[in-house]
Amino acid sequence: TPTPTPAGGMAPMIPAVKGDCPRFANGTITFMGLGGIKVAAGTKAASPGAPFVFYWHGTGSTSGEYSGMAAAVVQGVTSEGGVLVSLNGSTGGDALSGTSVFGKGDLDVGDQLVACAIRDHNVDPKRIFATGCSAGGLFATNQTVLRSSYMAAAAPNSGGMAFPQAFQATGVPALMTVHGRPGGDVVVIDFSQSSMTADNAYKKRGSFVINCNHGGGHCGGGGLAGDIWKFFKAHPYGTSPSPWKDALPAGFNSACKIF
């Protein structure tokens, strides 16, 4: 059943807790058989309003990648008593991440992390987001499609979609794609193109979409982490229309345009 929330808009469908939950505190944990999972957590909020962010790393990288790529996101999340989780390994990689760094089974791990954080750390069911770089950017985009019943928004840094995916029956998550110039953000695929593929898929769904071409190279969007955090804050689950539907807020990165 939908999780009731005090705010308006549609309610996300949160998975049930199954089995033991981890302790949400800064450090490295093993959960559901996966080691090396990094957790950045703020002091538990007094009421259920905190954010939760998945960070998915790139090929050949590790779960600690977020500290450099998404520093402003981590700071924002933890300052509000929220949780950022970054998996290191996979239950079994597949094409959802492009290079089999992560795979569909990891979505089940994500389901439990979300369910546990809502129950145990006062995370707001409407504030579940995903970001990541390269293979992780592809996976963040696809996770949000395949878990649109509760994911509020995705903001991949050189990510998008290499091939179409079907959204779940419910949910219209927002999207902010960050990428380099065409021909300059290429590792096997052109991430400006995969970003455009995702932009079009989400737009067709009815989502609010922002496209940010920073003009640089692969995973060069770390400087937009502050803008990603603003985007997440403004787009909890079910936000429609976007408060930014007519214009991006003052001071937002000029590389970004409403799609």
Give residue ranges: language-model regions.
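Solvent-exposed, polar/charged alpha-helical surfaces in well-ordered, non-transmembrane soluble domains
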Residues: D108-A115, R119, V145, M196, ...
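Cell-envelope and extracellular/periplasmic
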Residues: W56-S63, I118-H121, C133, A140, ...
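Serine-hydrolase catalytic machinery in alpha/beta-hydrolase-like enzymes
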Residues: K18-F24, T30-A40, P48-R127
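Soluble non-cytosolic domains of exported or imported proteins
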Residues: S47-A50, S100-D108, V145, I189-Q193, ...
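A domain-start/cap signature at the N-terminus of enzymes
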Residues: T1-F52, V83, F102-G105, T131-Y150, ...
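Mature extracellular/periplasmic domains of secretome proteins
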Residues: A71-S79, Q143-T144, Q165-F167, D199-A201
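The feature captures the conserved acid-bearing segment of alpha/beta-hydrolase catalytic domains
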Residues: S149-W229
